[in-house]
């Protein structure tokens, strides 16, 4: 049975939650052993797959879990805004470290390696490919190229001003176009994740609301401060 067929079965049984274990950089949780522990806990709690960034984290996670791992490498390049798995060398390294699915930036922005060449490299390694996209056009182009899944990962993150709500309209449009779509980006409540599935998502990736303690504490602190110190008393 193919990996995607296995995932289809897990999604039907467990519900389609992919957990992204990517701590805030520099956080006390930003440690491969801790990332691996979070990943194992997520698997035991019913995650159908995991999203892991960085070779060290992937190498720590892979021996502990049996669910598929979506892996990527983030880089800050001086000559390109693309951060997610920008180099062909990254694809090869992730494949050798045990990634099942390799995620790359699927936008049309200036980049060191073309989207098509990254896709070809992933498939040469016998891995499934995920395109992290920002728009309907990006995602449809990647799907037509032959990506195994497209994510709404970068919707709202490639221009000024990040929306608060997830892009459910993009999920719905991609599903209607026949894409295997992973809803990702700002799914901070179970209700939002469930709505994405109702809009046709194949699965939903949740990161900050599960694995970024600083973000979760920030949400609670903001709400509590507003309750304790209303604007008219500040």
Curated annotation (Swiss-Prot):
Pathway: Amino-sugar metabolism; N-acetylneuraminate degradation; D-fructose 6-phosphate from N-acetylneuraminate: step 3/5. Its EC number is 5.1.3.9. The gene is nanE. Converts N-acetylmannosamine-6-phosphate (ManNAc-6-P) to N-acetylglucosamine-6-phosphate (GlcNAc-6-P). The lineage of its organism: Bacteria, Pseudomonadati, Pseudomonadota, Gammaproteobacteria, Enterobacterales. One of its GO terms (biological process) is carbohydrate metabolic process. Belongs to the NanE family. One of its GO terms (cellular component) is cytosol. Keywords: Carbohydrate metabolism, Isomerase. The keyword Cytoplasm does not apply. It comes from the Bacteria. Gene3D superfamilies: Aldolase class I. Pfam families: NanE. It catalyses: an N-acyl-D-glucosamine 6-phosphate = an N-acyl-D-mannosamine 6-phosphate. GO terms for molecular function: N-acylglucosamine-6-phosphate 2-epimerase activity. It is an enzyme of class 5 (isomerase). It comes from Klebsiella pneumoniae (strain 342). This is Putative N-acetylmannosamine-6-phosphate 2-epimerase.
